[in-house]
Amino acid sequence: MKLIIEENADKVAEFAARYVVTKINEATENGKYLVLGLPTGSTPLGMYKKLIEFYNAGVISFEKVKTFNMDEYVDLPRDHTESYHSFMFDNFFRHIDINPANIHILDGNTSDHEKECEEYERKIKESGGIDLFVGGIGPDGHIAFNEPGSSLASRTRIKTLNEDTIQANARFFGGDITKVPTQALTVGVQTVMDAREVMILITGSHKALALHQAIECGISHMCTVSAMQMHRCATFIADEDATLELKVKTVKYFKGLMNHHRSLVMF
Amino acid sequence: MLPRKLKIDSTELAEITNELVQFLNCLVLRSGGLKKEHIWVRNGRILDERTVFFEEKTMADVQIDCEGLILSPGFIDLQLNGGFGIDFSTYNSDDKEYQEGLALVAKQLLAHGVTSFSPTVITSSPETYHKILPLLKPSNASSEGAGNLGAHLEGPFISADKRGCHPEQLVITSLSPNPVEIIEHVYGSTENIAIVTMAPELEGAQEAIEYFVSTGTTVSVGHSSAKLGPGEMAVLSGAKMITHLFNAMQSYHHRDPGLIGLLTSSKLTPDHPLYYGIISDGIHTHDSALRIAYHTNSAGLVLVTDAIAALGMSDGVHKLGTQTIHVKGLEAKLDGTNTTAGSVASMPYCIRHLMKATGCPIEFALQSATHKPATLLGVSDEKGTLDVGRLADFVLIDKNVTVKATFCSGKRVFLAQD
């Protein structure tokens, strides 16, 4: 795996966006679609902004891009400001030239959750699998909504959210905990593991312990992102704050590789 | 299939039918203000872009680059006496001539970004009303011209003292003993009437207001000598508007404010809101008076031009009903007097002047010529906003409110030549 340590969140976003651009251009040159797995949340926001800038500058087109989002709340109207459909539409999709027929977000308003999840896995397979899964992590090391205790072999499914997550989310729902969704549909850990490449974005000191557990401790379902240790091509991009819990030798080791990593996104 | 990318001057925009069109790179006026957004249109209606994206999962057939211009709902003028040499109060000899004049004005208004208007008729004889009113059937905007919202009948039930340019001999100063009978005798059918301006102090006025409201007509108080009391009674009876505030009414007095006092009346409630037309041409309303109105009751401010036949014409002598008007620059005076007639200012001019005189934001000025008049007339579920489902009647303007292009039902119906 790679750990790329950038100075701040803005640099993390820049690196991540450049990496996505590089992958899109490679796929386009090979006459192929690039299939992306996409997250929501404050951490990837910066990456989306950079990608929009690259699009507006004519550096990139999303014409040959397909997307699969990681998760979506259950029983939250699609057009609710906090739904992930809204997040992706407002912060990314409406600003670029992606064909809406090529985007996929789990439908949390379906009456048959199991079928919706099975269909989602089938569509990923039909698209040839995900080329690059971009993700963020929670302070407890969860990836998508695979919270502590989720099976590392899990697939796309409905998940009941834990109390901490619900309380943390209340601030997005007018501080009213009764309005916070209690369930979500989420891709599984194995679904992410099946991707050809995974890129995890981590910023802020509140994620430092999670990063430590993810890369310096053993693989554990109590920290689902630690499964990435077994991924054949995983990249973590962190800012300085997120490395505060890492051993000095770990940080020095990966910083020593930065020139090589930097060359991955030169254009 | 990828979208065809066009600019606003493309000839295709005048002929778009049922294609899915996305207007992008524009500042869209919505209730939250001016925001960089897109507008999606098909079959002449504004679509919900998320529904298009997530349900139809389709890309636009056509994308139109608006080059950073402001995209505002088309302007609405509730008081327009004519323009371009045509006077709505003049009926000469036949219906065809009148209809052609109306159509000419409607067509020319598109260049001013006006997509809806109320043809305004000043005090006239019953014979004239009976001939004109059937010809003023409401219509939607199209490439043929701005849409007709229905007639605005200013008079004849007005104060003789405050008639302004209205012909004295035709003014009717009482609606007693039978207001409904008198109205039907004078106007004929109320079917094509959108607004009636009347003086609330006349005998029988309150009953007349209730009658007009029951027929779906908006009542505006004006050309009046009324004190505040009758004005408040009018509002409680259902009147919703003051006609050209400050003009043709009693001046403000601290022991009886007259109709101007309605702006702060305790009788105003959500059930009885009040709008007022105001002419911000720099002539009819002093800038200081504009500021007084704006700071006293900004929610009720509605821009009207009260423009006459000379709108869009050069200086000279023009007709307004049976009256002769002399025009010089932006001033229009009744022949032989110093009485101000209607204005010769366009709606974009009035919007600009309101901003300059009051310092109000452009969003407020534009809303005062779009959403507010639409709400007042009860047509905001079709016009005056860019909300989903509405008619795609809009105008592209720059920050100086210069009209660059006008669209009706999604088709470009006017393009400014640079």
From Swiss-Prot, chain A:
Keywords annotated in UniProt: Carbohydrate metabolism, Cytoplasm, Hydrolase
MF terms (GO), sorted A to Z: glucosamine-6-phosphate deaminase activity; identical protein binding
Catalytic site: 71, 140, 142, 147
Enzyme class: hydrolase
Catalytic activity of the protein: alpha-D-glucosamine 6-phosphate + H2O = beta-D-fructose 6-phosphate + NH4(+)
Top-level taxonomic group: Eukaryota
GO CC annotations on file: cytoplasm
Pathway note: Nucleotide-sugar biosynthesis; UDP-N-acetyl-alpha-D-glucosamine biosynthesis; alpha-D-glucosamine 6-phosphate from D-fructose 6-phosphate: step 1/1
Subcellular location: Cytoplasm
InterPro entries assigned: Glc/Gal-6P_isomerase, Glucosamine6P_isomerase, Glucosamine6P_isomerase_CS, NagB/RpiA_transferase-like
Quaternary organization: Homohexamer.
Its biological purpose: Catalyzes the reversible conversion of alpha-D-glucosamine 6-phosphate (GlcN-6P) into beta-D-fructose 6-phosphate (Fru-6P) and ammonium ion, a regulatory reaction step in de novo uridine diphosphate-N-acetyl-alpha-D-glucosamine (UDP-GlcNAc) biosynthesis via hexosamine pathway.
The name this protein goes by in its record: Glucosamine-6-phosphate deaminase
UniProt source species: Caenorhabditis elegans
Swiss-Prot record, chain B:
Binding site residues for substrate: 165-166, 247-248, 255, 281-284, 340-342
Catalytic activity: N-acetyl-D-glucosamine 6-phosphate + H2O = D-glucosamine 6-phosphate + acetate
Swiss-Prot/TrEMBL keywords: Carbohydrate metabolism, Hydrolase, Metal-binding
Entry similarity comment: Belongs to the metallo-dependent hydrolases superfamily. NagA family.
Record-linked PANTHER family: N-ACETYLGLUCOSAMINE-6-PHOSPHATE DEACETYLASE
Active site: 306
Binding site for a divalent metal cation: 154, 223, 244
Cofactors (names): a divalent metal cation
Name used for this protein in its record: N-acetylglucosamine-6-phosphate deacetylase
Database matches in Pfam families: Amidohydro_1 (PF01979)
EC number assigned by the record: 3.5.1.25
GO MF term list: metal ion binding; N-acetylglucosamine-6-phosphate deacetylase activity
Covalent S-S links between cysteines: none
Species the sequence originates in: Caenorhabditis elegans
Keyword Metal-binding part of the UniProt annotation: yes
GO biological process, one term: N-acetylglucosamine catabolic process
Cofactor binding: number and manner: Binds 1 divalent metal cation per subunit.
